[in-house]
Amino acid sequence: FQIFMLKRTSQAAFASGMFVFPGGRVDGDDHLHKYDRYRVGPSQEQAPQVEALGYEWRGFWIAALRETFEEAGLILAYDSAGEMVSLASDKDYTRFQEYREPLHRHKLSLLEICQTENLKLAVDRVHFYNRFVTPVGRPRRFDTRFFIASAPEEQRGRHDEMETVESIWITPQEALKLHEQKEFGLMNVTRIQLEKLALFPDKHSLIAMAENQRHFLIRRPNLPPPE
């Protein structure tokens, strides 16, 4: 199976030139209860994920869906017929791509897109996986929740040409091999996640794990003390 990765611009203040997963910070609007009318899930089977995420679970899930569309152009949502949005037609693809820049510039919200397009966000298809916290002592620290989802078959994704300048579907094994050859820049946390993903033989086993996971890794690595 392949995963979608983005190359950050060399002008970025953080992880410049590195290949990363789609993602970003949680915005205040991501916590709004107004989204409850425009989402499906979390399902009963996802109750352990809700518990692991804590009282801010809504914001984390909405942020994951918003950033996936904003950065990668992948919209994980159901249309008015209850089918996953496909963007198979050029007209639909172009219309949705035109939402991305105003969304990035905070001139448009994901909630407004859902209202305009009559969408319900597919929270039930996006699964909390694990959490990584940057070690104390680093100049920039992050507390990151990682999610796993299967992209709709008809959607291919594309970088935003602002924060990211390249995009690629690639197997975890190939990404790790290219990284070893100094041809595919990765942060340590991304490399570790790829090593975990590479253990799964196919997409179905990976998604099955994500759907049924009951214990969630929280990794807080420590830096060696200064000499």
Task: Mark where each language-model region is.
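N-terminal leader/linker segments that precede catalytic domains of diphosphate-processing enzymes
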Residues: 1-227
